[in-house]
Amino acid sequence: MTTQTPDCKPRALIAMSGGVDSSVAAWLMQQAGYDCTGITMRLTRNETLGQSGFHTCCSEKDIEDAAEVAFALDIPYEVLDFTADFREQIIEKFVRVYEAGGTPNPCIDCNKYMKFRHLLDWAEAHGMEYVVTGHYARVEQDAATGRFLLKKGLDEGKDQSYVLYNLTQEQLARIRLPLGGLHKTEVRDIAEQHKFVNARKHDSQDICFVPDGDYARFMEDFTGKHYPAGDFLDESGKVVGTHNGAVRYTLGQRKGLGLALGAPVYVCGKDMQANTVTVGPEENLFDRIVYADEANWIAIPELTAPLRVTARTRYHQAEQAATVYPAPDGFRLEFDQPQRAPTPGQAVVLYQGDVVLGGGTITRVEK
């Protein structure tokens, strides 16, 4: 049950990462008349992940920065420990998908299984109506249908709607995204005007628990396994070299193969059981049809007929024209033009204009 403070201010939980975006989101909500409480989710401990030499999110410095901004805004602040759940729900799935030959997107899983689920539960338990984050996206209610819509952020270069496509109607009703109508330069200007300690802090770029980007080394440290060398194969199945473990390679990769075959070659496939990596020319990477499961629909209750859409199969990819069709376990997406290396395990997100129609997880692709 939610309650309001005696002066009738609506109450909001601010998810504070220690970065500039969530700090400005807190200030904006306070200025809008909300009674705010800052929360930082501790999701990892660097030392337990073998990452003590790196700066990652949830670091002690991030917590210090978030606490300092909360103090400057004179709002309550707490740190909640979700390291055990994060390990089980996010890191272990990340390892499983990579070991099965896919390419996971843990940031999307974190939003779905960790951030919004846990924060909305905590907010409700503490009488708060809303959860606020610093994502660059917008939530609006459709006056005609009553459905809550997820829209792109106005700053196209920072739009984060792709990683939020899994939000439900119930969640969207209680989420506020105050940065959706701003550009990053405006956000930094606000932070500087108010002398926030993190006003010029760099944006995080890598997966938070693998800040050096070496996924295979992280997985070996995490699991205690060693991923053995195996064969590079050409399109005919001929052995053309030796790789350092199939888990170390991603679809479409060219750099770091260590092959001299007279022409550029790219990773075109992996057989995790046989520990082989198939390489070939870049044209072999292009597929036109994508199948997805775990569909989540936002702008519509469900997909019942084909629709024209634009779609992204990677976070920062330009949208591509396509038609989406209902399928038994999700949907089938047929692009107008073949796409480079759509990869199982990644999200495919569908748009109509600036509205997120929905999305799902890629399971397989066809030419």
List PLM regions with ranges:
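AMP-forming adenylation/ATP pyrophosphatase catalytic core
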Residues: 20, 132-367
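ATP-dependent adenylation/nucleotidyltransferase module used to activate substrates
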Residues: 1-165, 176, 186
